[in-house]
From Swiss-Prot:
It comes from Cryptococcus neoformans var. neoformans serotype D (strain JEC21 / ATCC MYA-565) (Filobasidiella neoformans). SMART domains: DEXDc, HELICc, HIRAN. Disulfide bonds: none annotated. It holds the Pfam family HIRAN. Belongs to the SNF2/RAD54 helicase family. Probable helicase, member of the UBC2/RAD6 epistasis group. Functions with DNA repair protein RAD18 in error-free postreplication DNA repair. Involved in the maintenance of wild-type rates of instability of simple repetitive sequences such as poly(GT) repeats. Seems to be involved in maintaining a balance which acts in favor of error-prone non-homologous joining during DNA double-strand breaks repairs. Residues 386-395 have a biased composition (Acidic residues). This is DNA repair protein RAD5. The gene is RAD5. Residues 45-58, 118-129 have a biased composition (Low complexity).
Length: 1198
């Protein structure tokens, strides 16, 4: 037992003596080791003999001593930039008393000095932190909490006693540190020719050189404690704060963010260990809280697995953010101004949410470096397989469901509310077209975005920040001031907090963005190309725009932070050959950009070129299509002047990707001389159909990201296809900070939205309002008129019945597919065989179009689909392939020579003399697809085939319905074929269009042939309707869409046989052939013309207003894709009524797909084509498609 001075009298008594500045051990099992405390300068107290004051941006120097005190530098366990001392209750800017140690302040680095030119890759702070010179600390507020006594006896404290709050420093334990027995004789140095100093080691031998080197031991971070002790002004320890408060105060004290002071409110006169002491704690934000935090960029390029780790800096930011949030909630601090996001839905700041999104919410918390190889393998397997050229990315579970897509639609509508109030702007006289009012408004908005005009939008608070006020610190004895709510707060008392990253600022953080451009997301068919062309005419300035690209490029994403190859110093080997080579005399490209680069799908390249030529005064705008393997040198193209000047370069996504891959291979070579598209800066970059880059990991997206341009535009009718991260890719291309940073977008938008946080909708709405303009055809202007006045559109759904033979084939195929699905589902293997199920559904959809399509392979799923064709039903019905062969038995059509010539001559004479269209005896309508019976009576082909099948089902002899003669077999039927002169003028790739016997367009020949049963129900319906259109409008033009090019081949052969002129547009054609096809289709004609077009190649972007009839031959999973196809015709420039016909077969998979679409439970956005939602919803939808959940209603009205 040692003697102790009594706190009251100073006398000694037999008890362990509490030492000044050092903690006494308590009896609650706390750490028994002597832990040196941080040297503390008490607030409002002069009892301390000296204090330590460390400059805010420097570290303590090693070995600085004064008197008997030695300050040694030590790295904090929480953050490698922490100071060695937590200054608690100390004023950093106060005068330094005698004995104070002040470490020298280091100069700011060049990167910090210029940090206001680029936004951080980790947080959207304003410019470099601006801290007023007179700012010392700001009073945040006070709260009442409990403390637990660690002392026994009287005189330690009483109500009103001031207390000093202190924290022990955490220690780092170096496992590999030198043992105590090994002497360290100071730094290594040369003395009298000998090396002395350092830790002595053994002599180096050959064995030790060859021995395996031991990896240096890593520093083990000591367990983080949350003990906060408090003492009286005389230095006697009293107790510690409760765990609840210490949990969030400890980290803030350790990092110097806050300073604490307090006093005792109530306590027992005689303290006992563990008794409760009621305290009042005052909290101040220290000057260090507003210094630059978390701004250090990664010093190395991390691999994928390392990139998933939470770095030490990210951990420190997360702890700081969570601790500040808890502190603000404990004190009751409320923001006086929230961001624009909070204004949409009034909330009590971000503090009221249970838990905000982490800055790196998407990162894995576990370090892969400590995991086993097996765990790493599993991690890789869990990652989605991404193809560079694929359209899908990310987790399939993040696809938006129907409810979420409806929420996105509501966000669009809210973002459109102010669009009708935009001013109208006329384009220059060089633009020949007349813009509609809503297009003039778009020109106003786009021009302001490119000019960077801040007057269009008031300067507002950054969306991630909130504004707060420091409170007035009431000193004891001062009168209590009552603040007036209407009183304008003093600007020096304002501070700002980012609740997402935990950063604090004394400067107003604005939402200004250096990005020049945006997203023009008007609905399809509203003239986005025309509006962009007017902008090209309006803004053609030829002045250097400064280093805008470098200002915005750095803060978007770490993926592209590398210095462009064109700016790096290039070294060339000096050789004799290159010293004597010819000197190029071609003019160099001017130092400032002037050309616009348009990137679009290959099918739209020629259309962009033609539209620009039509809309521009001759010689005002020169455009060039840069496409194909024989592309001209881009440098020479941009260097042209006068008549050779090129203002707009049009290229395709495929060409750009090819150029990008070539540039990546060559840009780092020593002999690289430039000349790539990526070595030049453009005045403007325009992405048409910009949703093509929605996969941020695809090569085409990276190719677009890397382009250099002062202004960037994305044109798309669907900014969000099926994931919120589709929008991120556009923002990243546009260089819009901070949303173009993947970590921020995922943390603040994607994750909260998927977690059904309604505030995430406000974030998305704010983003869209700031950079997106979207109008729809149904919108009205300020006067209540529709902004787009288009002709009416009529959509007709024709529900058809299968023929008897087609029904048998389909039912057989459906039963086989359904049985396999039931077996897989019963075994629990349905989702693991998901691709096989999709292949079965593909075969069913093909069979609905035409049974012959089932015989062909369908891409990657062909082999899986082929298994369905094999026998194995076990019911004696034979092989499906045999059934289709029997159905197609009439495909070998006989020539006219195969028919009896006398019989043919007699019938042809009668047909040639007949002028009126005959009436069918079975349907009482005009005959379609005339068929001649052996008794010379005629009928519709569908009617007589159905009649013969019905008789066979009833075991009756089929006879003529007119005269009763029989029996009649299908082989006895003859078709009546009338052929008109039709040719295809595009290429020789489409044969069979000309009949040498026809000499004029009005010539018609009548022939007899065997009935061609290969024409399916849909084909016959299409031919019948085309024949009706030909009679009503001899100059009609129509589009026939199908997603199966093999079905287009059958339609092509059928049209050729019927003498109907057609053109073809699909993905197998070159860009030149596509352009020629569209040009030919747009020419005037005196006869009907049909364009056979694949849904994928021609469903988006094309302007085909020269047609007004649309036929959709099959049903797609996503109805929006079909609407896009219809909008190729129903768009600006259409002056005729549009008629749309959709063909479906009753009682088949098509009907059920439409029912799912109608009931709003569809597999949204092609989840059946290359993805899945949750397991339960996917299986439920597949069962609906197979017709397993309910009876198929044949009498349903569509």
């Amino acid at each position: 037992m040692s003697a102790e001075a009594s706190p009251e009298t100073g006398r000694f008594r037999t008890k362990s003596s509490p030492e000044l500045f050092f903690p006494a051990t308590d009896s609650e099992g706390e750490e028994q080791n002597d832990v040196p405390l941080t040297i503390v300068h008490p607030t409002q107290s002069t009892s301390s003999k000296f204090s330590i004051n460390i400059a805010s941006s420097s570290r303590p120097q090693h070995g600085i001593t004064t008197g008997d005190f030695e300050a040694t530098s030590q790295t904090s366990a929480h953050d490698n930039v922490d100071d060695d001392f937590s200054i608690v209750g100390h004023n950093p800017a106060s005068s330094h008393p005698q004995g104070t140690i002040v470490a020298p302040r280091r100069k700011r680095s060049l990167q910090q000095a210029h940090s206001h030119h680029s936004s951080s890759s980790s947080s959207p702070v304003p410019s470099a932190p601006v801290i007023r010179a007179d700012f010392r600390k700001g009073f945040l507020g006070e709260f009442v909490c409990e403390g637990w006594s660690l002392s026994k006896g009287r005189g330690y404290c009483s109500p009103g006693t001031k207390i000093v709050i202190e924290r022990p420093k955490s220690k780092s334990t170096d496992v590999g540190a030198p043992k105590p027995g090994r002497k360290d004789s100071g730094p290594v140095r040369l003395v009298n020719g000998k090396v002395v100093g350092g830790v002595k080691s053994k002599q180096m031998t050959l064995g030790s050189m060859m021995a395996k080197k031991v990896e240096p031991a890593k520093k083990v971070k000591a367990t983080t404690d949350q003990i906060i002790r408090f003492r009286n002004e005389r230095g006697f320890e009293i107790g510690r704060l409760s765990i609840h408060e210490a949990g969030f105060l400890a980290h803030l004290l350790d990092t110097g963010v806050i300073q604490l002071s307090g006093n005792v409110i109530d306590c027992p006169q005689n303290l006992t260990t563990g008794c409760t002491i009621l305290l009042n704690i005052k909290v101040y934000l220290a000057r260090k809280a507003f210094e630059n935090f978390g701004k250090h960029k990664r010093e190395e390029h991390f691999s994928f697995w390392k990139d998933q780790r939470e770095t030490a800096m990210e951990e420190a930011m997360r702890l700081r953010k969570d601790s500040l949030r808890s502190l603000f909630e404990r004190i009751g601090v409320k923001p006086i101004q929230s961001s624009a996001l909070s204004k949409v839905t009034p909330i009590q700041g971000v503090l009221n949410r249970q838990k905000g999104p982490d800055l790196e919410g998407s990162r894995l918390r576990s370090s892969p470096s400590t995991s086993t190889a097996e765990e790493k393998g599993k991690g890789r397997a869990a990652m989605p397989a991404v193809d560079d050229d694929g359209e899908d990315s990310g987790d399939e579970a993040e696809k938006l469901d129907e409810k979420q897509m409806n929420e996105i639609d509501s966000i669009y509508r809210k973002a459109q509310q102010g669009d009708t109030r935009l001013d109208e702007m006329d384009p220059p006289s060089t633009f020949l077209y007349t813009l509609r009012p809503y297009q003039k408004q778009a020109l106003t908005w786009m021009n302001a975005r490119e000019k960077g005009d801040s007057s269009v939008r008031n300067e507002s608070l950054h969306p991630l920040w909130e504004e707060y006020l420091f409170k007035k610190d009431q000193l004891p004895g001062e009168p209590i001031e009552i603040s007036d709510d209407d009183e304008q707060p003093d600007s020096t008392r304002k501070f700002y907090w980012n609740p997402y990253s935990g950063e604090l600022s004394l400067k107003f953080p604005t939402s200004q963005n250096l990005s020049r451009g945006g997203i023009l997301a008007d609905a399809m068919g509203m003239g986005k190309t025309c509006m962009m062309a007017s902008l090209i005419h309006t803004n053609r300035e030829e002045k250097p725009a400064g280093n805008l690209e470098s200002q915005t490029r750095d803060g978007v994403e770490g993926e592209i932070d590398e210095e462009p190859a064109s700016k790096r110093i290039k070294f060339k080997q000096v050789t004799l050959s290159n010293q004597w080579r010819a000197v190029p005399t071609a003019p160099k490209v001017e130092s400032f950009p002037r050309a616009t680069l348009v990137v679009c799908p290959v099918s739209l390249a020629a259309q962009w070129h033609d539209e620009l030529r039509k809309m521009s005064q001759q010689g005002s705008i020169n455009s060039y299509v840069w496409y194909g393997g024989d592309r001209v040198d881009i440098e020479a193209l941009l260097a042209g002047d006068g008549k050779e000047r090129v203002d707009v370069i049009v290229t395709s996504y495929g060409t750009l990707t090819s150029e990008y891959q070539k540039w990546l291979r060559t840009k780092d070579r020593p002999n690289y001389e430039g000349g790539s598209l990526y070595d030049h800066e453009f005045l403007r970059i325009v992405l048409d159909e910009a949703h093509n880059i929605r996969n941020r990991l695809a090569m085409v997206s990276k190719a677009c990201y890397e382009l250099k341009g002062q202004r960037r535009w994305a044109l798309t009718g669907t900014p969000i296809v099926n994931r919120l991260e589709d929008l991120y890719s556009l923002l990243h291309f546009l260089r819009i900070t901070p949303w173009g940073n993947y970590s921020f977008f995922r943390s603040f938008v994607t994750v909260p939205f998927l977690n059904q946080d309604h505030k995430a909708l406000n974030v998305v709405q704010y983003i869209l309002e700031s950079c997106l303009l979207r109008r729809e055809k149904t919108m009205r202007d300020k006067d209540g008129r529709l902004i787009v006045d288009l002709p009416p559109k009529t959509v007709e759904i024709k529900v058809l019945q299968f023929s008897r033979a087609e029904r048998q084939i389909y039912k057989f195929l459906e039963e086989r597919a359904k049985k396999r699905f039931i077996d897989l589902d019963a075994d629990g293997r349905a989702m693991s065989n998901y691709t096989s199920i999709l292949a079965m559904l593909m075969k069913l959809r093909q069979c609905v179009d035409h049974p012959l399509l089932v015989l062909g392979k369908s891409g990657e799923d062909g082999e899986l689909g082929e298994k369905i064709l094999e026998s194995g039903a076990g019911n004696g019905e034979g092989n499906l392939r045999d059934m289709i062969a029997m159905y197609a038995g009439g495909i070998r059509a006989e020539t006219p020579e195969d028919v009896d010539k006398a019989y043919a001559a007699k019938v042809l004479k009668e047909l040639g003399e007949q002028e009126d269209t005959p009436i069918c005896e079975l349907c009482s309508n005009e005959m379609f697809d005339e068929v001649l019976l052996p008794c010379y009576h005629r009928s519709c082909q569908d009617c007589i085939v159905e009649w013969i099948g019905t008789c066979e089902d009833q075991n009756k002899i089929a006879s003529c319905p007119s005269c009763g003669k029989g029996p009649i077999k299908l082989a006895d039927l003859r078709s009546v074929q009338r052929r008109h002169k039709r040719v295809n003028p595009i290429t020789d790739a489409y044969p069979g269009g000309r009949d040498p016997n026809l000499k004029s367009s009005n010539d018609t020949t009548v022939t007899l042939g065997k009935v061609d049963l290969v024409t399916s129900t849909k084909l016959r319906a299409l031919l019948r309707q085309l024949e009706e259109i030909r009679q009503e409008d001899p100059k009609a033009k129509a589009l026939v869409f199908s997603q199966f090019t093999s079905f287009l081949d059958l339609i092509e052969a059928t049209l050729t046989k019927q003498g109907i002129r057609w053109l073809r547009f699909d993905g197998t054609m070159s860009q030149a052939q596509r352009a020629n096809t569209i040009e030919e289709f747009g020419r005037k004609t005196n006869e009907p013309l049909i364009l056979l077009i694949s849904l994928k190649a021609g469903g988006v972007g094309l302007n085909l207003t020269m047609a007004n009839y649309v036929f959709l031959m099959d049903t797609w999973w996503n109805e929006a894709i079909e609407q896009q196809a219809i909008d190729r015709v129903h768009r600006l420039g259409q002056n005729k009524p549009v008629y749309v016909t959709r063909y479906i077969i009753k009682g088949t998979v098509e009907k059920r797909i439409m029912k799912i679409q109608r009931s709003k439970t569809a597999l949204v956005n092609a989840s059946l084509s290359n993805g899945a939602k949750t397991k339960e919803t996917t299986l439920a939808d597949i069962k609906k498609i197979f017709g397993m959940d309910e009876e198929d209603s044949e009498g349903e009205v569509y």
